[in-house]
């Protein structure tokens, strides 16, 4: 057997071992009497996340039926556990005079700082221009750390509308900002199903779609199509996804579904550190260009969006000079290929 065959067999064995381990953890988590924070719950989810974070060649979309069923069940369990965890810490924070002074009590707060830095860096690079004035976050939950970090560290002049289907989650979230004059003035919490939000979407410069809003691929595709119908042309969409084994924790979003929803996909970024979510930056397509009277082709037809999308991995936050040079080189290569 050649070297290539040995490597292939090793990869298959590693993937099978990983799926087997995650299947066992999913079974153990499914047998827990409660997903509220406890030593047992925390230990199992810590082991699960630790198993899924390292770079992996596993393709969750290519799993067999049993593994796919396990994965779908596990993502729902992760969503429930995340909701319990956020509600628990939201209540703890609300007991303080100014909850926003104590956000570091949340054990994964640093992950949100890094994810928000990454998302803002990608937005600034791929959607240049004035800073967003109005931002919507869809699926903000009882502990809206993403909005809070973005507002405090990256978008100090923007207003944020946070949408969640749960009125209880929004009540918890609103308690956190009441004592802070700045956040209280810029943060609004709206209880609604995303599919029912229509005309309001026209007013946002950026819309963030949380990873767990639309957990099934078909549901996510419908939501993206809904956003494509109602967002303003030129507005940015930030979609959280997952890659590799991290797809056992969160849904994987196909960039092609975002294109079909009426968006130009600008970049896809897969972190390889403790930031679990991949990030897709897209922009609502402008209205079709006018058709010249004496020709059968549109005037100033833009190049198809799918030709120039860059899929990138760290540098985190896209802030370092090396990352910037590499990204520019990717763009130059893409343009050369399109012109060839």
UniProtKB/Swiss-Prot annotation:
GO biological process: nicotianamine biosynthetic process
Pfam families named in the record: NAS
InterPro entries: Nicotian_synth, SAM-dependent_MTases_sf
Enzyme Commission number, as recorded: 2.5.1.43
Catalytic reaction list: 3 S-adenosyl-L-methionine = nicotianamine + 3 S-methyl-5'-thioadenosine + 3 H(+)
Name used for this protein in its record: Nicotianamine synthase 9
Keywords: S-adenosyl-L-methionine, Transferase
Record function comment: Synthesizes nicotianamine, a polyamine that is the first intermediate in the synthesis of the phytosiderophores of the mugineic acid type found in gramineae which serves as a sensor for the physiological iron status within the plant, and/or might be involved in the transport of iron.
Main enzyme class: transferase
Family to which the UniProt record says this protein belongs: Belongs to the nicotianamine synthase (NAS)-like family.
Native source organism of the sequence: Hordeum vulgare (Barley)
Record text on subunit structure and interactions: Homotrimer.
PANTHER family with a match to the protein in the record: NICOTIANAMINE SYNTHASE 3 (PTHR32266:SF12)
Disulfide cysteine pairs (residue numbers): none
Protein induction: Fivefold increase after iron deficiency.
Any one GO molecular function term: nicotianamine synthase activity
